[in-house]
Amino acid sequence: MDRQCSERPYSCTPTGRVSSAVSQNSRISPPVSTSMKDSSCMKVHQDSARRDRWSHPTTILLHKSQSSQATLMLQEHRMFMGEAYSAATGFKMLQDMNSADPFHLKYIIKKIKNMAHGSPKLVMETIHDYFIDNPEISSRHKFRLFQTLEMVIGASDVLEETWEKTFTRLALENMTKATELEDIYQDAASNMLVAICRHSWRVVAQHLETELLTGVFPHRSLLYVMGVLSSSEELFSQEDKACWEEQLIQMAIKSVPFLSTDVWSKELLWTLTTPSWTQQEQSPEKAFLFTYYGLILQAEKNGATVRRHLQALLETSHQWPKQREGMALTLGLAATRHLDDVWAVLDQFGRSRPIRWSLPSSSPKNSEDLRWKWASSTILLAYGQVAAKARAHILPWVDNIVSRMVFYFHYSSWDETLKQSFLTATLMLMGAVSRSEGAHSYEFFQTSELLQCLMVLMEKEPQDTLCTRSRQQAMHIASSLCKLRPPIDLERKSQLLSTCFRSVFALPLLDALEKHTCLFLEPPNIQLWPVARERAGWTHQGWGPRAVLHCSEHLQSLYSRTMEALDFMLQSLIMQNPTADELHFLLSHLYIWLASEKAHERQRAVHSCMILLKFLNHNGYLDPKEDFKRIGQLVGILGMLCQDPDRATQRCSLEGASHLYQLLMCHKTGEALQAESQAPKELSQAHSDGAPLWNSRDQKATPLGPQEMAKNHIFQLCSFQVIKDIMQQLTLAELSDLIWTAIDGLGSTSPFRVQAASEMLLTAVQEHGAKLEIVSSMAQAIRLRLCSVHIPQAKEKTLHAITLLARSHTCELVATFLNISIPLDSHTFQLWRALGAGQPTSHLVLTTLLACLQERPLPTGASDSSPCPKEKTYLRLLAAMNMLHELQFAREFKQAVQEGYPKLFLALLTQMHYVLELNLPSEPQPKQQAQEAAVPSPQSCSTSLEALKSLLSTTGHWHDFAHLELQGSWELFTTIHTYPKGVGLLARAMVQNHCRQIPAVLRQLLPSLQSPQERERKVAILILTKFLYSPVLLEVLPKQAALTVLAQGLHDPSPEVRVLSLQGLSNILFHPDKGSLLQGQLRPLLDGFFQSSDQVIVCIMGTVSDTLHRLGAQGTGSQSLGVAISTRSFFNDERDGIRAAAMALFGDLVAAMADRELSGLRTQVHQSMVPLLLHLKDQCPAVATQAKFTFYRCAVLLRWRLLHTLFCTLAWERGLSARHFLWTCLMTRSQEEFSIHLSQALSYLHSHSCHIKTWVTLFIGHTICYHPQAVFQMLNAVDTNLLFRTFEHLRSDPEPSIREFATSQLSFLQKVSARPKQ
């Protein structure tokens, strides 16, 4: 034992004894006895003077006192005791590593690691002593000790030369030792050597070189160490790494003669092709050997030798991925010096039979062909490595390499292996080209085919998973291709953008993507080295939460880098052509994704858009003098996305809009914005993982600080204000694009987009609506989108935008809406109402529509001899007429219609005349056809006629409307021959009803008398001749002026106008003495009522009516009572024509005397009410019509209440409810009138007309219901019996309501009649 201890370097006796004691009895607990501690302390104290590893002072100061020295000795004693305890504890833990279970082993290793960080030298000494004291320990125990020693050496800051030599010798002795643990035992020993290299790699490298150049093929462990050293990035500094690589090259040069040694060459090839425990990962020894082989071939001067070795290598199996990568690396390294030879070998190998069989056109003949299945992948990787390693001479070869790669891509079996090989090779090729000087002076003609392969590859990527870097690699390659000459054509570039956007943006949500991706990822390979791991005591934790968490983190990183690759590609494209056209081209492919219905697609698209704008804003690549193209569309889309429900989309949209604002300001001022740091003028080359120049990580890493936020106030504004400020910087064309974008957004199915589009449209019109030039197409588009807007607030804002737009573009909007108003639907009508929401605009809309009515083309042969009208013009005219009709009912146009009544009134009458002109026959026709042609179709004249009716009714002139409606005079407006009579009746009604609009209409029609259009002059003279009877005429047109106007009419080209002017000149207004003459003719005319001829009587009654009209304000005087009495006597005449004429004359008399209070006439009116009421059911339609009209006129004279309701009832109501209302109006006036009316009704019970008898019976029935006593006091027995018989007869009436009423009245009558009279 003493001998052993004396031979140990820097070994201390106490530690040795403790080690011996522990080794002799493994069951002793870690704490040692007190005696042992004392003995150890003495030994340690004796040897402490010659040790340099202790940290306490070795010199005793002589001037210290005895007590100070005693204290120092006590401290040293405690320190030595602590070290001894630590050594003993470590020794015991090293011993327990042999039998510890996995969990205890993990605990021991952790404790030793902590000790090594505090005192690595002590731990190394303890482990060394343990090896010396226990030479027969098991291989598994040694394996664990090697691992521990590797950890301790790595934790040590300095490794002393003695320990370095000792552990180097220990490693070299065990690296080649064969044990039951196989390779993992050797690798553990080799890793010790690697750990020593951290402190002194040159010494280790010298050992390795010596072993490598012996002429005997080196052992696997030696290659393992060299492989680890070559692949590690942490062992060497940059300078040492270069030295190591240079030393490898020198080793390769010295190894060239070995290529001629058959045994060495075969051993090399066998080692390279022997399958490993796993082919998923390349072992360090194989990875180094492929590199070393390539360096040797690179150093070989004989090209034939190089070809022979490469051919032999390629003829081995290509089944495993790492094998293919290694072959490609060897070929690439050889190509650095032997490019022609390598190219020839690859070309020959590509044409060989195994390769041809591996293509899809030929199926494998047997299972051995499986080793050739992925040979195409090897070739692809080889071309990539050739380009990467021989980049100094590669430019002339690029097109050839690309053509070969494209060929193998298209004609090889498609799988993940081929795809990844193709991408890897292409990345290496693009890297070599980009790093080659003079690449920009070359033109590469195969880039478009390579780009097509990339697009095919991305389209084949599964759309629901993201497991690989294929997408980002393909986009990085595309970014590099964009820099080469010649530039990519627009069509291919468009395909590239569409493919990339679809492949990235259309990926599912991250949660769904994570779920799908984790299912596709391979679980940990628990079969890796199963026997060796089991023997070594290794464990596997399984596929648990940590693995899932790793999957999530991996996916997040993969997704982020994929998005960054897309952003980098967009930045590369804009850098190659930094123009506004190129920016618009790129953004135009983004718009479809910015408008996606899926939130995550919008979020991704707007993020890429924001990154691109931020890149341009911070680097100022675009020329400030160049105008943006269609930037308004981008502003509109970003503005809508600022209202996106997704918060991330909102933020990106707002930030993108802010950067866009700064770009616009830059272009406006003509000064490029500068980045915080100096902006590069070219995109920097992507690093190994392809990070873009400006990406989302940069955004997160450098957020806008408070100072920059304060400087760039735009980033502090809300989205509404940002978009509003941007609008201020847009040109007119850009504003139009923005508005068009907003209009398109109205048709979206996303509620938020519709709402945002309406707000933006309203804002744009509010701020800049007056500047817009052409709004017709915009208005049409709004109409198309309006039907799909179901959000009330959005529709309201859209219509409000139309209202604001109409302030400056009324005529254009009216013309546009006219073109889409046939047929008129609710959405178009809403637009018309929006036009009139402003009072000034509503007047202008009506004026514009009236101006449209002036375009009245006539067919050939019409009175104006105008050319044949175009169909479009006629439809426009019809639409204007229809809108004038519909807008009268719109609340927004109520005031405008009221104020524009005179113009509308004359225009509608003129339009009706025009429509009737269109329906005149153009040539002589048979009698029946002529009659049909003379009657216009309902569509031709109904619109203007209905518009006139609604004008009268909606503006408060319903009295005038009632006059024509109750007479059924609207039919007069349907033929050209009766049209003048209809206009005359309407004008007469206005005069009789004292219409307030007569002065205004007069002022409006006077200019029409001078119109070049005959129809306008005709309408004006028709109305003027009737207005001559109005008292207010002289307020507008003095008598002399009226005479002048009528005299001028005598010279009018139109015969009709001349006749009407002549009739006007004969008016009593100009001949006052004519009144007495006409009054004197009334008595003889009344005597003529008793002529024998019916026609004569009717004609005389008509003459009397005309005389009453011509007398005008003078009236008939006292003769009115006689006219009334004479006329009433014919109400019950058996002759229909005479009854009708009598009622008409009575009505004219009542109207003529309406302003005069004659008690006798009022009595006649009271007495005529029941007959008129009963004749409402007259069998003769003419009599019934005249009865209605006269009844209404009498009610007006008597000043009944609810006249409008009375008119509506007379005009349109039917049934018992109408009869009840008329009875109520008649019988509730006064007791005197009640008696008169009831007496008259009772007298009609004896009528020979069944209709009259039925009608009066119902009338009396209503009276009995409400005034039974008053009725029965006036009934005699005959009248009562007659009532019973009549009600009994009505019980069988065909009308159910009358039968029901008769039954109830009969029962009631029986009960009342049975009561005794009081």
From Swiss-Prot:
Biological source species: Homo sapiens
Name the residue ranges with Polar residues bias: 12-38
Q: Which UniProt keywords apply?
A: Repeat
Q: Which PANTHER family match?
A: MAESTRO HEAT-LIKE REPEAT FAMILY MEMBER 5, MAESTRO-RELATED HEAT DOMAIN-CONTAINING
This protein is called what? Maestro heat-like repeat family member 5
Region feature (Disordered): 1-38, 676-695
**Placement of HEAT repeats on the sequence:** 581-618, 769-811, 840-880, 996-1033, 1037-1074, 1076-1113, 1118-1155, 1164-1200, 1278-1315
The beginning of the lineage is: Eukaryota, Metazoa, Chordata, Craniata, Vertebrata
Q: Name one GO cellular component term.
A: cytoplasm
